[in-house]
Amino acid sequence: MAERRAPSDAAQLAPAPQRPHLILGSASPARATLLTNAGITPTIWHSGVDEDALIADAGDRATDPILVTQLLATAKARDVADQVRSGAVPGIPAGHVLVIGADSMLAFGGKVLGKARTAQEILERWAAMSGRSGVLFTGHTVIDLTNDRQVDRT
């Protein structure tokens, strides 16, 4: 019968895997709050993506909320990842770093609605939507800077 041995001291003292440092490439206070409430404290870093220009470049495809939200989420994540790699984002520890980019759009009344730009636009949308419903689409891109792996979901 084989003798049972206790794990070696080295195995018992092996450090736990390091939790990745998360960078949220979004200006959305709601996204930051959601992560914080889940016990994750991200570094917040806004991308330099010109959303209006990207949507304009999408042409006819800009009517597809799935495509547009994913296009914007990916562009934001890649922009922030590039900034981190270049050293433009201060206070990022060495090690495992993940960047999240996200964007949401509302499909309502046959249109894709981006962010309202003014208080008046918000009031007009609320009035138009009263008693009706739309569909909110959110695109997410996560980039692992350790291996440049990218995952996209809408």
Predicted feature locations:
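N-terminal polybasic phosphate/anion-binding patch
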Residues: 2-98
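Phosphate-binding/catalytic loops
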Residues: 2-12, 135-154
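Short glycine-/acidic-enriched loop or helix-start segments at secondary-structure transitions
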Residues: 34, 83, 109-111, 147
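Residue-level signal for inorganic ion chemistry
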Residues: 35, 73, 103, 122, ...
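Acidic/polar active-site rim loop that often engages polyanionic ligands
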Residues: 54-58, 106-108, 147-154
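Glycine-rich phosphate-binding loop
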Residues: 94-104, 108
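Active-site-adjacent loop/tail segments of enzyme domains
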Residues: 104-134
